[in-house]
Swiss-Prot record:
It holds the Pfam family Kunitz_BPTI. Disulfide bonds join C1-C51, C10-C34, C26-C47. This is Kunitz-like toxin PcKuz1. It is found in: Secreted; Nematocyst. One of its GO terms (molecular function) is serine-type endopeptidase inhibitor activity. PROSITE patterns: BPTI_KUNITZ_1, BPTI_KUNITZ_2. Belongs to the venom Kunitz-type family. Sea anemone type 2 potassium channel toxin subfamily. Weak serine protease inhibitor that has been tested on both trypsin and elastase. May also act as a neurotoxin by inhibiting voltage-gated potassium channels (Kv). In vivo, is lethal to zebrafish larvae. It comes from the Eukaryota. Keywords: Disulfide bond, Nematocyst, Neurotoxin, Protease inhibitor, Secreted, Serine protease inhibitor, Toxin. GO terms for cellular component: extracellular space; nematocyst. It comes from Palythoa caribaeorum (White encrusting zoanthid coral).
Length: 51
């Protein structure tokens, strides 16, 4: 949860969530589809549960 948001180099447009440690909230972003880190969740609920 402390890793930065990582969009990745691919060009897909997948809606995902990450934990923003600055705001202390799970926030949405558009994921490119490859080269993710561990701060990448399919739903806001999954993000909140993990972080």
């Amino acid at each position: 949860c402390m890793e930065p948001k990582k969009v990745g180099p691919c060009r897909a447009a997948m809606p995902r969530f990450y934990f923003n440690s600055a705001s202390n909230k799970c926030e949405g972003f558009t994921y490119g589809g490859c080269d993710a880190n561990h701060n990448n969740f399919q739903s806001e609920a999954d993000c909140k549960k993990a972080c």
